[in-house]
Each structure stands twice: as structure tokens, then as C-alpha cells.
């Protein structure tokens, strides 16, 4: 019951780090694709 939200909690920091990395990296498309695939709920706008 509490393990479900736990998954999102440990995934949240990972997504933030990935997004920041993609923004600074030239191959952001690769990281962005992987990042989006990992989290279908969070979708950054254009």
C-alpha cells in the first residue's frame, strides 16, 4: 500500500536529474526519450 508511492518518490529525483542533464547535453533527444519512457505521468511541455 505504501510501496506504490515509494516508487514515485525514488523515481522523482531521477527524472529531475535526467531532465537537467538532457537540457545541457546536445543529445537531449536520447535522454528525453528514455526519461519520458520511464515516466508516462510527467510530460514536459515544449
Curated annotation (Swiss-Prot):
Name used for this protein in its record: Lariatin
Comment field on protein domains: Is composed of a ring composed by 8 residues, and a tail of 10 or 12 residues. The peptide is threaded when the C-terminal tail is inserted throught the isopeptide-bonded ring.
Keyword rRNA-binding: no
Record-listed cross-link Isoglutamyl glycine isopeptide (Gly-Glu), residues: 27-34
Removed propeptide positions: 1-26
Modification after translation (UniProt): The linear precursor LarA is probably cleaved by the putative peptidase LarD, generating linear 18-residue Lariatin-A or 20-residue Lariatin-B. These linear peptides are probably cross-linked by LarB. Finally, lariatins A and B may be exported by ABC transporter LarE.
Record keywords, A-Z: Antibiotic, Antimicrobial, Bacteriocin, Isopeptide bond
Positions of the record's site feature: Important in resistance to hydrolysis: 43-44
Biological process, per Gene Ontology: defense response to bacterium; killing of cells of another organism
Amino acid at each position: 500500500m505504501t510501496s506504490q508511492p515509494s516508487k514515485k518518490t525514488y523515481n522523482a529525483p531521477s527524472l529531475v536529474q535526467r531532465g537537467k542533464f538532457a537540457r545541457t547535453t546536445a543529445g537531449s533527444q536520447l535522454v528525453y526519450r528514455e526519461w519520458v519512457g520511464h515516466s508516462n505521468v510527467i510530460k514536459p511541455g515544449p
